[in-house]
Amino acid sequence: MEASWRQVAGGRGRSRGRATAAPSGNGVHLRGAGGGREKGSVGAVPSGTSPGGVATTAAAGSRHSPAGSQALQTTAASELMSQKKFEEIKKANQAAARKLVEEQFSSSSEEGDEDFEGKQGKILANTFITYTTQTDGDTRELERTKQYVNEAFQAGAMTCLICIASVKRNQAVWSCSGCFCIFHMPCIQKWAKDSQFLVSSVTDDDFGKKDCPWPCPKCRFEYKRSETPSRYYCYCGKVEDPPLDPWLVPHSCGQVCEREFKPPCGHKCLLLCHPGPCPPCPKMVTTTCYCKKAKPIPRRCSAKEWSCQLPCGQKLLCGQHKCENPCHAGSCQPCPRVSRQKCVCGKKVAERSCASPLWHCDQVCGKTLPCGNHTCEQVCHVGACGECPRSGKRFCPCQKSKFSLPCTEDVPTCGDSCDKVLECGIHRCSQRCHRGPCETCRQEVEKHCRCGKHTKRMPCHKPYLCETKCVKMRDCQKHQCRRKCCPGNCPPCDQNCGRTLGCRNHKCPSVCHRGSCYPCPETVDVKCNCGNTKVTVPCGRERTTRPPKCKEQCSRPPTCHHTSQEKHRCHFGSCPPCHQPCQKVLEKCGHLCPAPCHDQALIKQTGRHQPTGPWEQPSEPAFIQTALPCPPCQVPIPMECLGKHEVSPLPCHAVGPYSCKRVCGRILDCQNHTCMKECHKVTKTDGCTGKNKAGPECLHCEEGCSKSRPLGCLHPCILRCHPGECPPCVQMLRIKCHCKITSLYVECRKITTADVNEKNLLSCCKNQCPKELPCGHRCKEMCHPGECPFNCNQKVKLRCPCKRIKKELQCNKVRENQVSIECDTTCKEMKRKASEIKEAEAKAALEEEKRRQQAELEAFENRLKGRRKKNRKRDEVAVELSLWQKHKYYLISVCGVVVVVFAWYITHDVN
């Protein structure tokens, strides 16, 4: 059965798509299945309407018996149920639409958050399960790793510091191995490329080409050029382009991490592929203390170094005392004791730390050197003083002459020119050998300025700086050098960068530079409405980061008549509408209002300014909060319908006589149809009127008779709908006879009541059958059905094979091959003579052809021999003609006459 809304829309039966309404005496309008239906109507009548406008059922069988009425009532009940369900769904959809307009934060979001948190907890447990089994459930060492994993799950928690955009699950990323910060793959590739270009543009000119590293944008950890990321890998580096799996940590492969711990201990990480640093090694190893005195005990590999707290006892560097500190790692501390110690020269004694026994005083040695003339001028030192520095061979001041003199005499000058290179580095000293430094160079030379743009003649020792300012751009490529007489190696820019960072809140504090600025190092706390929950994000992300989901309960007072509002979490904006039952006492009936609280319902504002023309943009609809009155009471009260079909619960506000919208179903006077009116009141005028008997308010059947006709009769009953049997059909039928030539007119009742033989007689036209037999003669029978009988008695002529003898026989015997005519002796003699004549003609034709060919051959030979002389006689050949050649025409004509005479004689004799 179709749903009620589908039946209303399309209709069924003969009147589909046709709205019909039959006026009745009491003003009730009947609607067919194709017509419109009022809102709130129950069920659809699965019937059409007759041309007269009276409703009819879709099947005739359901009209004749009480079983049909029962089926109709069952259909109406099911349609009523479908219509009720449709109304319920419609109301639910309307309520959902109103709720979507009214609520800013629905409880479904909180349930979704709880589901997400539960799912996240399962993924975290699966990620850390292999680690927690090693640590007996202790997760204190996993806090830092948990923070990274939680940020990977939270939308907007992971931020690329280069583009200041959130990192999504389906984007290719790269993780720094130093600070474990996450960056977009295109961003970090561009960052590495720009960094290498900026460094290489400076170092290639000064130091030649070399492998330029590039730093991490956050921790400045340097990577080689070969370590520039080119492919997207998971956190552990095992899987390239890891697929997106909602049950795994984003950007992970789901396999065991197996990265080596830092510092390396020989073990590998047991967690599933994860972001952030690996936790400390949870393996158990047997190890001893630092001083090796205590017995080895099992400890975690990450905390395998331990102290037994006993005195160390190792001898210190002083060689006199032992270390008194508790068992410790590394070398022992210097000896803390103090003692009186001499300096290395032994002249002074002082109290000093025992850890530094060697020390120097500030006195000159003063010991007499081996020469006996001078004393040692070194400050307190260890060992012998050495030889006198003035002993042995010494050079003159210009280093050209060598002298062997006692240490008490000074080396004299040699008298030669000094010839030392002056401070200018170009000229040499022209004075004689002298003591002390050479004087400044005073020669005048053509000097170029430092930038190489100007020349000037001036003393060599004076520098020449022009006043031209350098216009080259500094390494920042923003500011000019502006230094006077710059040699080309412009100094780095000393101004502040001052560009606004990607966060749009701060400016770059670095020195002016090329390329992109480093990300803003500041962080900002994004808080919930109550401030109890916060999340720390990079500076600049606070404008696009959603506030964290606070699990605290909202503490705002209720705005409706209830004493307390429904519990819900902390949120921004106004609280969601109250959904508690109203529970106000209704004035009319005294029942409690069960509807949700409607003190602050959102109502679309009407009567606003209407645009005067198409040039004005229509304003958006505005909603205002207002208190609505309580809806009508919906407490169910049992009531019986007008037609006594059912007892249904009605809402309290609608208690009263009602129509159940079913079909009346009472049997009309025709005893064939039922009343198709909607449920209505029936008054009983006669005491014997039964419950199923139609009353004066029911319909009066105005349809034609729709009873089934006899087999073969296609004419409707000429009477209106009536009880009992229909009269016989007297319509004249036009039929073809068996031979399909003549049209006959017969009453319909004779055809429908006749048997096979009678029908054959009625269809016979009493004329000869016009059909041809297979032999070609016409059938001799009267108009008949079926195939014609094959009993042809017509006379046919039959001849012998030479066509000379002719006889007449019956057609059926000839077709049955019962009679045949053979040639006699006369026929054979005539055949023989005819064959002889043909042979003679063929022989004559052959001889004639031979003579013609002989004549052609002789003519050809004559042409080959050429012309003969005139006095020669031509050779003549006499050819004798045969008898046939001489008299052939005469013989042929005589033979023809003889054959004709003979044939005429034979034919005349046979007849």
UniProtKB/Swiss-Prot annotation:
Belongs to the NFX1 family. Residues 67-76 have a biased composition (Polar residues). The modification Phosphoserine is found at S50, S65, S106, S107, S108, S109. SMART domains: ZnF_NFX. Residues 822-873 form a coiled coil. This is NF-X1-type zinc finger protein NFXL1. Pfam families: zf-NF-X1. A zinc finger (RING-type) spans 160-220. The lineage of its organism: Eukaryota, Metazoa, Chordata, Craniata, Vertebrata. A zinc finger (NF-X1-type) spans 269-287, 322-341, 375-394, 428-447, 455-476, 480-499, 507-526, 674-702, 715-733, 777-796. It is a single-pass membrane protein. CDD domains: NF-X1-zinc-finger (cd06008), RING-CH-C4HC3_NFXL1 (cd16697).
